[in-house]
C-alpha cells in the first residue's frame, strides 16, 4: 500500500512539473509576442512621422522652386479658420492655403504671409496694376484677382472679410511702399467688417505704425468729419453708400469705404510710377504722401489680436 501511495505521489509530481513547465513556456511565448507587437507598432509610428515630415519638406521644396501655381495641400487633416491656425500647426512657409472661417459654408484660397511674425491672412494686394479694381458690387462682395502667383493682385471679398473678422478680434496691418524704395506701415486693432445688411461697414480700433493714421482722419480734427473711414459703408460705382453728393467710387475708379471721399484709398487706380495728378484717384495714403501721390505697392493683412508672433 505504501509503495502504491509513493508511486501516485511521484506520478502526480511529474505531471504537475510538466504542466508548470508548459505554462511557463506559454507565458514566455506571450511575452515574446507582445514585445514583437510593441516593436512593430513603434516602427509604424516612426514611419508615419517620417512620411509626414517628407510631405512637409516636399511642400517647402515646391515653393522654394517657385512652383506657386497650386494651393499647398495640408492633407485634409483639419480645416483652418485663418492663416494663424495654419502657422500654429507648424506650417511656416508663405503661400496659398485653403481656409474655412467658422461660419463660412465652404473653403476658399488665400495667401498666408508667414513672415513678419507669421500667421497673416492677406486680404488685399496691389503690386503692378495687373488687376482692374474698378469693379461692381458683386465682384467686391465675392472677391476677385490673381489667387495663383505670390505677388498677384487680389481682393479677398467683402463677404469673406465679414466671415473672418466676426470670428474673433483681429489686427489689420497695412504695408505700404512708394516708388523711391521707401516703406511704411499702419496697424489697427479690432478690425471688423460688417455684414451685407450693413453694406460691409468698416470698424477699426487703436492705431500704431509709421505711415500715419489715414483711416480715422485723426491727423486733423477739421477734416475728420469728411475724411474718416470709420463706420463707413462700402461703396462701388453701382452701389453708392458714401456721404458725398456725387459718387466717390465712380470718380476714384474703385470700391472702398468712402466718406466724402477719402484720406485713404488702397483700391484706387494703379499709376505705374510717381505722378502729379489733377485728381486723387490713385492708391492714396494721405498721412504719408498726401492725396496726389499714388503708391507702388500695398498689402493688407490680418491676424488675431492675441496671436503670439514668431520672434525669429
UniProtKB/Swiss-Prot annotation:
One of its GO terms (cellular component) is extracellular region. SUPFAM superfamilies: Fibrinogen C-terminal domain-like. The keyword Disulfide bond applies. Residues 1-22 form the signal peptide. Keywords: Adaptive immunity, Coiled coil, Disulfide bond, Immunity, Secreted, Signal. Residues 39-60 form a coiled coil. InterPro entries: FIB_ANG-like (IPR037579), Fibrinogen-like_C (IPR036056), Fibrinogen_a/b/g_C_1 (IPR014716), Fibrinogen_a/b/g_C_dom (IPR002181), Fibrinogen_CS (IPR020837). Residues 74-306 form the Fibrinogen C-terminal domain. Disulfide bonds join 83-112, 248-261. One of its GO terms (biological process) is blood coagulation. It holds the Pfam family Fibrinogen_C. Its main location: secreted. It is found in: Secreted. Immune suppressive molecule that inhibits antigen-specific T-cell activation by acting as a major ligand of LAG3. Responsible for LAG3 T-cell inhibitory function. Binds LAG3 independently from MHC class II (MHC-II). Secreted by, and promotes growth of, hepatocytes. Homodimer. Interacts (via the Fibrinogen C-terminal domain) with LAG3 (via Ig-like domains 1 and 2). This is Fibrinogen-like protein 1. It comes from Bos taurus.
Amino acid at each position: 500500500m505504501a509503495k502504491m501511495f509513493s508511486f501516485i505521489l511521484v506520478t502526480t509530481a511529474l505531471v504537475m512539473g510538466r504542466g508548470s513547465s508548459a505554462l511557463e513556456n506559454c507565458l514566455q511565448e506571450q511575452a515574446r509576442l507582445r514585445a514583437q507587437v510593441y516593436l512593430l507598432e513603434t516602427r509604424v509610428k516612426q514611419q508615419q512621422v517620417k512620411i509626414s515630415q517628407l510631405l512637409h519638406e516636399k511642400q517647402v521644396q515646391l515653393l522654394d522652386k517657385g512652383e506657386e501655381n497650386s494651393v499647398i495641400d495640408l492633407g485634409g487633416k483639419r480645416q483652418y479658420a485663418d492663416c494663424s491656425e495654419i502657422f500654429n500647426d507648424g506650417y511656416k512657409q508663405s503661400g496659398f492655403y485653403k481656409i474655412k472661417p467658422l461660419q463660412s459654408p465652404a473653403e476658399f484660397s488665400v495667401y498666408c504671409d508667414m513672415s513678419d511674425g507669421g500667421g497673416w491672412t492677406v486680404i488685399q494686394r496691389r503690386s503692378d496694376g495687373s488687376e482692374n479694381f474698378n469693379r461692381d458690387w458683386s465682384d467686391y462682395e465675392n472677391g476677385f484677382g490673381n489667387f495663383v502667383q505670390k505677388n498677384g493682385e487680389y481682393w479677398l471679398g467683402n463677404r469673406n472679410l465679414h466671415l473672418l473678422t466676426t470670428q474673433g478680434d483681429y489686427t489689420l496691418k497695412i504695408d505700404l511702399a512708394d516708388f523711391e524704395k521707401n516703406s511704411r506701415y499702419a496697424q489697427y486693432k479690432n478690425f471688423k467688417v460688417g455684414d451685407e445688411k450693413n453694406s460691409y461697414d468698416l470698424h477699426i480700433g487703436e492705431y500704431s505704425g509709421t505711415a500715419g493714421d489715414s483711416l480715422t482722419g485723426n491727423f486733423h480734427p477739421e477734416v475728420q468729419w469728411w475724411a474718416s473711414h470709420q463706420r463707413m459703408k462700402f461703396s462701388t460705382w453701382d452701389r453708392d453708400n458714401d456721404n458725398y453728393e456725387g459718387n466717390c467710387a465712380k470718380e476714384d475708379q474703385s470700391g472702398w469705404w468712402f466718406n466724402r471721399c477719402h484720406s485713404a484709398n488702397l483700391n484706387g487706380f494703379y499709376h505705374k510710377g510717381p505722378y502729379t495728378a489733377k485728381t486723387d484717384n490713385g492708391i492714396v495714403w494721405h498721412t504719408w504722401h498726401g492725396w496726389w501721390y499714388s503708391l507702388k505697392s500695398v498689402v493688407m493683412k490680418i491676424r488675431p489680436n492675441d496671436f503670439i508672433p514668431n520672434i525669429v
